[in-house]
Amino acid sequence: MRLGIALFSLIGLCHSVSALIAFPGAEGFGANAVGGRQGEIYVVTNLNDSGEGSLRDAVSATDRIVVFAVGGVIEISDRIVVSKRVTILGQTAPGDGITVYGNGWSFSNADDAIVRYIRIRMGKVGDSGKDAITIAEGSTMIFDHVSVSWGRDETFSISGTASNITIQNTIIAQGLETHSCGGLIQTGGGVSLFRNLYIDNKTRNPKVKGVNDFTNNVVYNWGGGGGYIAGDSSGDSYANIIGNYFISGPSTSVTAFTRGNEYFHGYVETNYYDPDRDGTLNGNELGVSASNYGGMALVDTKYDYPAVEYQMTPGEAVNYVTGYVGASKVRDSVDTQLIAQVKSWGTKGELISDEASMGGPGDLDGGSPPTDSDGDGIPDDAETEIGSDPNTADSMELHSSGYTYVEMWANSLVPSSYH
């Protein structure tokens, strides 16, 4: 038990911080991430790569909730390394939100991270052989409505001793050639992948080993390296694969599932595959046989992992993914192009070696900083609505719900449910 939580319980709070989910709608292995709830507020006030008021400075210390008084593109030269117990609330940015461009991020050992509504676009100028997002150690993290693209090794990779991680409602796109990988998901500590879009990655969409729940995802236009790669290893794996839709695109030359073996144990249910690239979404359910699932060892009983609240059909998953995933409070030009590719139902899409073909990170409307009289990160007009005081810096005080007031405000800006 965390010391902070133990102290809270000793003074008789009527709710337990540890019992809260990270935000309404958080699911899976990482749903109980605490983030910076027991720390301090940090307001990002500029688009600089470093220094006071920058995003890099914001995530450099533990126990922070990060909000934004500015929108736009933050160009970074070096990788961003995130500290423990940090919450990043990209939905609080004005205008078109935040894109971080030019290099990747490390969340290794960033225990209890909560990351929402932000675009992380690495690009050709980023460090060679590095991921757009990497997690090699650490526990209890959740990534929600993130748009991540253009990794130079993997795009979103989880490995090593990392445990209790959720990636939900996220776009994982266009790992750059020649590697062009969606990502390794290779840890025995538990990873939930719910309602995500993997698109335009030559391989590893994802490559899974260990404990994994892969539910209601859409995989589009994978290349010859493979769609869902089932372990390809003598290490034991135990996965649920439920309600997903695999759609071939112009670059697709292999079937949806590859490289399974007797060590990869999969519970499979109602997964669809549309291989014909004819401009119409008309796939069929994959029969429950090892030959349809890359030779993995199929099991009859679903693994008892923390599940989605509502399990969609594959068709519902496609509708949801094309409408709402990624940093979708305002979709930028990159995500708009990617979604248009999916909705071509096989006729559009490409593997890229340079983000210039997508127009780079594009331009974002920075919006206007809100009036915040007490400087606590919550705009004055919102404070009245949520019951805090616009003249007192009280954003980190706990509401009766157990969330801080700043979390209450941020949660109110975006949908709390997907069904």
Swiss-Prot record:
Q: Does the keyword Transit peptide apply?
A: no
Intracellular or extracellular location(s)? Secreted
Catalytic reaction equation(s): Eliminative cleavage of (1->4)-alpha-D-galacturonan to give oligosaccharides with 4-deoxy-alpha-D-galact-4-enuronosyl groups at their non-reducing ends
**Which residues are listed for Ca(2+) binding in this entry?**
D274, D276, D278, T280, E285
Entry EC number(s)? 4.2.2.2
Residues in the signal sequence: 1-19
Q: What gene is it encoded by?
A: plyC
Instruction: Report the protein's function.
Output: Pectinolytic enzyme consist of four classes of enzymes: pectin lyase, polygalacturonase, pectin methylesterase and rhamnogalacturonase. Among pectinolytic enzymes, pectin lyase is the most important in depolymerization of pectin, since it cleaves internal glycosidic bonds of highly methylated pectins. Favors pectate, the anion, over pectin, the methyl ester.
Main location per UniProt? Answer: secreted
Q: Which PANTHER family match?
A: PECTATE LYASE C-RELATED
State the protein's name: Probable pectate lyase C
Protein family: Belongs to the polysaccharide lyase 1 family.
What's an example Gene Ontology biological process for this entry?
polysaccharide catabolic process
Name all EF-hand domain ranges. 261-296
> What do the Gene Ontology cellular component annotations say?
extracellular region
